[in-house]
Amino acid sequence: MYPEYFPGYLNKGLFGKAMGQLWNLETVNIRDYANDKHKVVDDTPYGGGNGMVIKADVLAKSLDENIKEKEKIIYLSPRGKLFNYKYAKELSNEKSLNLICGHFEGVDERVIQSRNIEEVSIGDFILSGGEVAAFVVLDSILRFIPGVLGNENSAQEESFENGLLEYPQFTKPQIWE
């Protein structure tokens, strides 16, 4: 719903240098697929309840018109599979990855089921929107794409590579206080 958030900081530093060469980013505004003049993309939950739900017809149309067959689709949701280092590494091998940034109470479940969408969570907490979660996922994945990091060994020597946390880090000067 807010494509203007992207690429954000991903357009800076090493990620920014690699953007357009080693990785690409496209955004879709689902409001462009709304059927009314006000571009409404949400409605109240069927059966009642608090909050709003992203409408099935709008989301499905945006997916159908923008995603090719067999491309992986992930809906960023607090109830999904927990995102971790191992999964980031696995996703870095995908030719294309489509992230749905949720808002409100979520998206109509019928779209998730009918489009073979995987739900992924970055943790047990609630964010105001899925864009922050998308940045977490993208940042983690981009590190594994060969050539993105300045040093090829950096991604292989990460603290999680051996299942352990990294040792304390120091730099110069040796005595600072």
Q: What residues fall within each predicted segment?
A:
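N-terminal nucleotide/polyanion-binding subdomain common to many enzyme families
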Residues: 1-66
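Hydrophobic/aromatic beta-strand patches that form the interior of the parallel beta-sheet core
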Residues: 26-28, 74, 97-99, 118-120
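A short acidic, often aromatic-flanked loop/helix-cap motif at beta-alpha or helix-coil junctions
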Residues: 31-36, 81, 126-129
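Short, well-ordered secondary-structure micro-motifs
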Residues: 38, 85-87, 110-112
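S-adenosyl-L-methionine/SAH cofactor-binding core of RNA-modifying enzymes
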Residues: 53-103
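Structured adenosyl-cofactor binding patch, chiefly the S-adenosyl-L-methionine
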Residues: 111-153
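Internal, active-site/partner-interface "lid" segment
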Residues: 132, 144-177
